[in-house]
Amino acid sequence: MSVSIKPLEDRIVIQQVEAEQTTASGLVIPDTAKEKPQEGEVVAVGPGRIDDNGNRVPLDVAVGDKVIYSKYGGTEVKYDGQDLLVLSARDVLAVIER
């Protein structure tokens, strides 16, 4: 997926992984009962924040990384017909290595 959006400072843009629609036994989960997703793919990264000495601090994630992030972190946005999440790099809890 190509996203032409550039986040500022230490922010990243994530394409969220959709929550399961059914249980293992085949029951359909209504939207009101679904857990908020906490996993997604990084589609854009900012240049990093500036520290107290004026040096740019690079981010620990890159475009294409699969990440787990804080449940209530970030801001949901709709851009170019896609639902995306913009969040601070400090809201990323882990990078998934598969």
Swiss-Prot record:
Q: Which GO terms describe its molecular function?
A: ATP binding; metal ion binding; protein folding chaperone; protein-folding chaperone binding; unfolded protein binding
Q: What is the superkingdom listed in this entry's lineage? A: Bacteria
What protein is this chain from? Answer: Co-chaperonin GroES
* Gene assigned in the entry: groES
Q: Does the keyword Lipid metabolism apply?
A: no
Task: State the organism of origin.
Answer: Clavibacter michiganensis subsp. michiganensis (strain NCPPB 382)
Q: Where in the cell is it found?
A: Cytoplasm
Q: How does it assemble?
A: Heptamer of 7 subunits arranged in a ring. Interacts with the chaperonin GroEL.
| Protein's UniProt keywords contain Lipoprotein | no
Q: What UniProt keywords apply to this chain's record, in alphabetical order?
A: Chaperone, Cytoplasm
Q: What does this protein do?
A: Together with the chaperonin GroEL, plays an essential role in assisting protein folding. The GroEL-GroES system forms a nano-cage that allows encapsulation of the non-native substrate proteins and provides a physical environment optimized to promote and accelerate protein folding. GroES binds to the apical surface of the GroEL ring, thereby capping the opening of the GroEL channel.
